[in-house]
C-alpha cells in the first residue's frame, strides 16, 4: 500500500473522476466514498485499478455481523487496497468483516472508523450520548478494532500519537481532516496540516477539497505530497 496522500475523489460521476485523473501522469492513491460508489458502482473501481492507482473504498460498513460479513465477501472481489467498517458495530461485526474479506482476498487492509473528524465534543455528549472525551471514545473504538484483528483505524491526526503509544506503530492511523496552511476548514473540526499529521504519527492522510477543488490540482497535490513525505 503506497505511502502517498490519499486523494478523496468526492465527485458525483465517472466523467468527472476521469477528467481529474487525466491531469496526472503518475500512480496515485485515491479514496472512493459513498457518493461516488453509489452513483457508479463496482465498475468504476475496476477502471481506476486498471489505470494503476491504489484504491481506498470508504463505505463505513455498519450492520449486523452476518450482513457485514456477506457484504465484505462481495467487496473483496474488487481487490481494492483498503476498506473500512464502523467500529461502533462491535467486535463481532468487525471479526465477521475480516472473515468475509479473507474468503476471496488476502492482501486488502481493513480498518475501522472511530469518530468522524466533523464530530465535536458537544456532538459526542449530546447527540451520541457518549460521556467521555473524543480522545477516550476514539481509543475505546481503536482497542475494539485491534481486538477484532483489524489493521488499524480512521481517526483524526490529533489522536494518532495516543494510538501509537497504546497500540503500536504498525497499527494504521488513516487520518482525514488534513488542511494545508491557509486552506478553508470546511466542515472539518479536528484538523492538522500534512506536516503535523506526520509528526503526530499518522500512517496515511486523506485529502479531498484542497486538491480536487484547487485551481491547479496537480500542483496542490505535489505540495501536499512533499510536505507529507518530508
Swiss-Prot record:
The keyword Cell inner membrane does not apply. Its EC number is 4.1.1.23. Pathway: Pyrimidine metabolism; UMP biosynthesis via de novo pathway; UMP from orotate: step 2/2. One of its GO terms (cellular component) is cytosol. It catalyses: orotidine 5'-phosphate + H(+) = UMP + CO2. The active site is at residue 60. The keyword Lyase applies. Substrate binds at residues 10, 31, 58-67, 117, 179, 188, 208-209. One of its GO terms (molecular function) is orotidine-5'-phosphate decarboxylase activity. Keywords: Decarboxylase, Lyase, Pyrimidine biosynthesis. It comes from the Bacteria. One of its GO terms (biological process) is 'de novo' UMP biosynthetic process. Belongs to the OMP decarboxylase family. Type 1 subfamily. Homodimer. PANTHER family: OROTIDINE 5'-PHOSPHATE DECARBOXYLASE. Catalyzes the decarboxylation of orotidine 5'-monophosphate (OMP) to uridine 5'-monophosphate (UMP). This is Orotidine 5'-phosphate decarboxylase. The lineage of its organism: Bacteria, Bacillati, Bacillota, Bacilli, Bacillales. The gene is pyrF.
